[in-house]
Amino acid sequence: MAHSQLLSSEERLFCYRWFHSLLAKELSEPQLQALQAGQFASFFAFLAELGFQPQVTDLQNELAKLTAYDSPRLELAADFAQCFLLEGKLSALPYASYYLDERDLSENLAVMDQWLTKFQLKINRLHNEPSDHLCIYLEVLIKLIETEQPVQVQQQFIRQQLLGWLPQWAEKTAQIHSSTAFYQIISNLLLGFLQQDIT
């Protein structure tokens, strides 16, 4: 049964907000400390119950390994840049435009523009964040859940707006050579969660 039917809206919101917080920008010191201090232990157990035990174990192992670094946060910041901020041949750019052809992208962004207008979501021009950034999609999905849009609408958004390109992004992220596998694991976990959310 899909998460959208199995889980409460609050549980799904927590999950998608968590993914958004990890992928929107480099982790802050408080974010990393919370992860390492076990503040998300119950959440990790929750993910494991949903069938993501391998990813949870890998993530916990990576968090443990970070303690060996003099500056774990800076190490993760470097990994974030390596995974997502360099040019396309070197990074897994988190933009739909990098993976969709012109026609599919045009259709995808037309739907996105409708939802952005409906929810009055403003793109962060200060950081030059295009509307096809992964985290903008997650913001719209969060709004769909918050405003209690029909489950079919939420699932259609995931299927058509995200899963048309996210598997390629996650696959490319998995191929990036970085100091840790933190973001590779998070990307794989997000993809798996989205796929379960519509099945």
From Swiss-Prot:
Coiled coil: none annotated. One of its GO terms (cellular component) is cytoplasm. Its main location: cytoplasm. GO terms for biological process: protein complex oligomerization; protein folding. The keyword Nucleotide-binding does not apply. Keywords: Chaperone, Cytoplasm. It comes from the Bacteria. Pfam families: Nitrate_red_del. It is found in: Cytoplasm. HAMAP family: TorD (MF_01150). Belongs to the TorD/DmsD family. TorD subfamily. Involved in the biogenesis of TorA. Acts on TorA before the insertion of the molybdenum cofactor and, as a result, probably favors a conformation of the apoenzyme that is competent for acquiring the cofactor. This is Chaperone protein TorD. The lineage of its organism: Bacteria, Pseudomonadati, Pseudomonadota, Gammaproteobacteria, Pasteurellales.
